[in-house]
Design a protein with these regions (language model features):
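C-terminal outer-membrane/trafficking sorting elements
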Residues: 416-487
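N-terminal capping/linker segments that flank leucine-rich repeat
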Residues: 12-91, 95, 112, 133, ...
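Canonical leucine-rich repeat
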Residues: 84-85, 106, 127, 148, ...
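Short, conserved beta-strand segments of beta-strand-rich sandwich/propeller modules, principally
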Residues: 306, 385-389, 469-473
Length: 487
């Protein structure tokens, strides 16, 4: 214990007694005499220095000195400092943290020992780090720098440029890069083909139209949302855990190599079909506002999987199981055209063991089909050319009502649905509509506008109904229908 105390005292004595590098202290003193960001104050006052003519450099906050009286570290972040900081020629300086100040220039020329620089949140308009060949960490986010050359910094592993007006950036000589941030720039293109060790990429809020991160086998997180992407290549990204690509213009996305994928926010694109069957660990998918109508899930999805898929084109039959849905309503109104005697919505009839309910309207008037069988419908020929509205509900998805606008065309045959044999028969005589059947049968009679005007129940034999002259549709309980003229 005594030996340790003696060593510490000896080191302290050497630090106090050592001469500090005259060139470095002169450059620091010049900076300290400049105006600070706080009005009416100088930089030296922000650091608690009383007199720049009598500075005890060993006690100045944030400075670390090494052998020969050379600076090895400067930690001056968030001090309300301002002006021009010239550190050129500080060839022992390894760490510089001067972020969150109001610096207007920063010179690091010939500082070849630098490995770590944080100068973000300042007012810098240019930076030259071409002589900082050992630099590993550099962050200059939220300044005003339009160009930066990092081709002379092959040891960079961390690079953050966010919030600067870059349009292009050359990463061709940064093979060790593992984290790259360039959010809220003006990037129009970026090439990652020579950065095989990347684990995290953030290029959100730029002007990118294409992005290729294929074969980045170590990539775990990709943030590329809020761009103009029409193409995104993630082939070979076998370690990708999170892909945030929402607010783009994507029409397709191949995730077949992304087996590790867990988190996938993709809303506000134009992806009609999405296949995540190759992603067994996916636990969050957000696809709102894509016009999506198909979502293919893994064979055995995680029980914790949550899906947000409202404002798309899903039908009941295409929606994922309710247990996975955090939100799913509304879905887009659908438009179809069909012959009046063959409207087929049977795909939505039985979903998750629940039977759907169909409600038909012509404007605000409810319409009863002349025939209805498990989601297949027939309507009077007189409705040809009209557009009916069908609302479909299903108890399996209680928050959703599907709406179809169905334009009816001419029937495919004069007889809506022809029976397989001559029985039962429907005909008219002297103002009577007559139904004949050898077995119990119910006949509902409609006008051509779909208004029901009567019901006949036939036990065996014949039943009749007096009607005004006209053309009628008779819907029989055996699933067939007839047209008949009453005179």
């Amino acid at each position: 214990m005594l030996l340790a105390v003696m060593v510490c005292l000896t080191c302290a004595a050497r630090l106090v007694g050592q001469p500090f590098h005259a060139g470095e202290t002169a450059q620091l003193r010049a900076f300290l005499r400049q105006n600070a960001a706080d009005e009416g104050r100088k930089n030296f006052q922000q650091l608690g220095i009383a007199d720049t003519n009598a500075i005890d450099w060993a006690t100045v906050t944030g400075l670390t000195w090494g052998p020969g009286g050379r600076l090895t570290a400067i930690i001056w972040n968030d001090k309300y400092l301002a002006g021009d900081l010239d550190l050129s020629g500080f060839d022992s300086l390894r760490v510089l943290r001067c972020q969150v100040n109001n610096l207007t220039s920063l010179l690091l020329t010939r500082d070849s020992a630098l490995v770590h620089v944080d100068c973000y949140d300042n007012l810098l308009t240019r930076m030259d780090i071409t002589t900082n060949v050992n630099l590993q960490h550099f962050c200059c986010r939220y300044n005003r720098i339009a160009t930066l050359d990092v081709t002379h910094n092959p040891r960079l592993t961390f690079l953050c440029l966010s919030g600067n007006p870059f349009t292009r950036f050359d990463l061709s000589n940064n093979p060790l890069l593992t984290e790259f941030y360039a959010a809220k720039c003006s990037l129009e293109e970026i090439d990652f083909s020579r950065n095989p060790l990347l684990k995290l990429v953030s290029v959100r809020s730029n002007k990118l139209k294409r992005l290729d991160v294929s074969n980045l086998a170590n990539l775990q997180q990709l943030f590329c949302y809020d761009n103009q992407l029409t193409e995104l290549n993630v082939k070979g990204c076998k370690s990708l855990l999170r892909l945030a690509a929402y607010d783009n213009r994507l029409t397709r996305l191949d995730l077949s190599d992304c087996r590790a994928l867990q988190n996938l926010p993709l809303y506000n694109n134009a992806i009609a079909e999405l296949d995540v069957t190759a992603c067994p660990y996916i636990d969050f998918i957000s696809t709102m506002n894509n016009g999506m109508q198909t979502l293919k899930l893994p064979l055995l999805p995680l029980k914790a999987l949550e899906i947000m898929c409202e404002s798309n084109r899903f039908t009941f039959s295409a929606l994922p199981k309710p247990m996975y849905l955090r939100s799913y309503t509304p879905q887009a109104r659908r438009t179809i055209t069909a012959p009046a005697d063959r409207v087929d919505l049977s795909s939505e009839y039985t979903v998750q063991s629940a039977t759907s309910v169909y409600t038909w309207r012509d404007g605000t008037t409810e319409v009863t089909p002349t025939q209805s069988h498990e989601g297949r419908f027939s309507f009077p020929a007189a409705l040809s050319g009209r557009t009916l509205t069908c609302e479909v509900t299903n108890a399996a998805y209680p928050k959703l009502t599907l709406t179809y606008d169905v334009t009816l065309t001419a029937p495919t045959a004069n007889v809506l649905l022809v029976a397989n044999d001559a029985r039962p028969t429907v005909h008219s005589e002297r103002g009577l509509l007559i139904v004949t059947s050898e077995r119990p049968l119910t006949a509902r009679v409609y006008t051509l506008t779909g208004v029901q005007v009567g019901t006949l129940r036939v036990q065996r034999g014949e039943a009749s109904l007096a009607l005004p002259p006209g053309l009628y549709i008779v819907s029989l309980s055996d699933g067939t229908a007839r047209k008949v003229v009453v005179e």
